[in-house]
UniProtKB/Swiss-Prot annotation:
Protein known as: Large ribosomal subunit protein bL17
Cellular component per GO, a single term: cytosolic large ribosomal subunit
Gene coding for it: rplQ
GO biological process: translation
Keywords: Ribonucleoprotein, Ribosomal protein
Length: 131
């Protein structure tokens, strides 16, 4: 029986799953939006949100806990210097999942997962000259 077993297996063994979510969490913190399948996005939310909650209180112990989970110093610095102060007044729910259709190759449902309150940079308008 499968009672009280939380989390999705995603057809991977445990070390592959841990490495995949470590990489996806790093990418999400670095770029603040990534595109992935819906089940992976829902599981990634369970990995990233506790890290952001940890980053709201800056201490050496919390930085070491975050480094133990992500293993990337640049990401830990961004978590504690940018994302922690950004979400200090929010009590959870730091990510948003936007479904965006299905993948062409295997018809898998695809979604964007993004951090809330991210700054969207406007592309500069290009001026075309007839030269």
């Amino acid at each position: 029986m499968r009672h009280r077993k939380s989390g999705r297996q995603l057809n991977r063994n445990s070390s592959h799953r841990r490495a995949m979510f470590r990489n996806m969490a790093s990418s999400l913190v670095r770029h603040e939006i990534i595109k992935t399948t819906v089940p992976k996005a829902k599981e990634l939310r369970r990995v990233v949100e506790p890290l952001i909650t940890l980053a709201k209180t800056d201490s050496v112990a919390n930085r070491r806990l975050a480094f133990a989970r992500i293993r990337d110093n640049d990401i830990v610095v961004k978590l504690f210097n940018e994302l922690g102060p950004r979400f200090v007044s929010r009590a959870g729910g730091y990510t948003r999942i936007l479904k965006c259709g299905s993948r062409a190759g295997d018809n898998a449902p695809v979604a964007y997962i993004e951090l809330l309150d991210r700054s969207v940079s406007e592309p500069e308008p290009t001026t075309h000259t007839n030269a």
